[in-house]
């Protein structure tokens, strides 16, 4: 997606459909949505979603044994 795709009247602001996609991706990735196409993903966050402890790539699953049945 390039800058000319947005047109001069938008000046980088996200459209309705793209804003919905951005909100959905922000919800899935655990970060705040971007307000402009030029904003980096970490611009509106206090932390980078790549270094967040609950980032999907950092989740570790440990298998526990089942409870003993009488």
From Swiss-Prot:
<protein>
    <recommendedName>
        <fullName>Uncharacterized ORF4 protein</fullName>
    </recommendedName>
</protein>
